[in-house]
């Protein structure tokens, strides 16, 4: 029972909180803050009970999994705080359905991370997917939000069918859906079973779709553009971290006796993601769409770490996705503090000259952009350096050179943001009331970007 405590706790918090919010509608803000406090307590419970060994063959808990869940929950809490402060800033009523959907989505991610069985992993991913579709379309009267959510749902449903079809192949040719059983077969069978490999590839399509890696990335620009900013922070941070951990959990199945087949497939996906992400962003004017392409690019970098297939590569991948999640949250909170209700229309045009009127926010956005480029001594530099160093050390020169090349290309549009703020004509922006939750998040991000490198080094 203690092993399932994080999942049970979050489910109860979500459902009971929703019930109280419906019964006492005029106290939504108080209930919302209580739920955030309970989620913070859940972080410590998740970490505390993560040392117990798994009670089921299909469900694993260990210290590393507990740490992963705690980090994901922390990023989720940040997204919830952003939603609360954004609602206060623009004068909207807090909708408790948002926190319910997000917490249930996290339960799905937790199940997926602990899964050691393809069917259980599929169920966890689908719970996350279904709630994510609703979060993407949470702006009910917005055409772009509805369009993005519908596209996300249709493509996601198609990929889910492929994933389930893949599980049937795995069971049919492997005789089991347990990770350990399939791994034992792959390591001991003298002949490779093509049907088993096809099944694994079909199942992987679902993970790559949720990661928004190319060529399964076409949904993400429209979804980011139409979704509420709070949902976008969740998709960029907690959701992506969870899917990267899931991918690392099944990495032994991806790269085994059939190494050349799946290795080359994932290598192509990584290179395409880096190229599409880098060049696709150049023509963008919307800052939310720009970050969508930036996500595609950075997922390509993460896949480099997965392809290295060693502990150092996995550490580099996890470190990089964590740094990118923090940087993205910093960028989105700055946009909220600048534009408030008009944040969805934020573009290069709307940030022109803001350095004259919003010096602190412009400086923070600049630091975020420099970290994304990988300029030392910011934390983003050490994330990229560690990743590319491990790739070169493993003699993966193609991946390393492609990563360095696309980093140079991406520097063009990251610096374009800085140029618009400091070297363009001023456009008047109304100063909005200060929201201390957003301000605290921004200062924490700033501290991480400036001093996080010392943690990495020492």
Curated annotation (Swiss-Prot):
As recorded in UniProt, its EC number(s) are 7.1.1.-
| Recorded GO CC terms | plasma membrane
Q: Which domain of life is it from?
A: Bacteria
Q: Name one Pfam family in it.
A: Proton_antipo_M
Is Transport included in the keywords of this UniProt record?
yes
What is the uppermost EC class here?
translocase
Q: How does it sit in the membrane?
A: Multi-pass membrane protein
Read off the InterPro entries from this record.
Answer: NADH-Q_OxRdtase_suN/2, ND/Mrp_TM
Q: Where in the cell is it found?
A: Cell inner membrane
Q: Transmembrane stretches, by residue range? A: 2-22, 30-50, 71-91, 93-113, 118-138, 153-173, 196-216, 235-255, 261-281, 290-310, 319-339, 361-381, 397-417, 438-458
Please provide the record's keywords in A-Z order.
Cell inner membrane, Cell membrane, Membrane, NAD, Quinone, Translocase, Transmembrane, Transmembrane helix, Transport, Ubiquinone
Molecular function GO labels: NADH dehydrogenase (ubiquinone) activity; NADH:ubiquinone reductase (non-electrogenic) activity; quinone binding
Functional summary from the UniProt entry:
NDH-1 shuttles electrons from NADH, via FMN and iron-sulfur (Fe-S) centers, to quinones in the respiratory chain. The immediate electron acceptor for the enzyme in this species is believed to be ubiquinone. Couples the redox reaction to proton translocation (for every two electrons transferred, four hydrogen ions are translocated across the cytoplasmic membrane), and thus conserves the redox energy in a proton gradient.
Which PANTHER family does this chain map to?
A: NADH DEHYDROGENASE
The Swiss-Prot or TrEMBL record describes its family as follows: Belongs to the complex I subunit 2 family.
| Quaternary structure and partners | NDH-1 is composed of 14 different subunits. Subunits NuoA, H, J, K, L, M, N constitute the membrane sector of the complex.
Name-wise, this protein is NADH-quinone oxidoreductase subunit N
Organism, scientific name: Rickettsia prowazekii (strain Madrid E)
* Organism phylogeny: Bacteria, Pseudomonadati, Pseudomonadota, Alphaproteobacteria, Rickettsiales
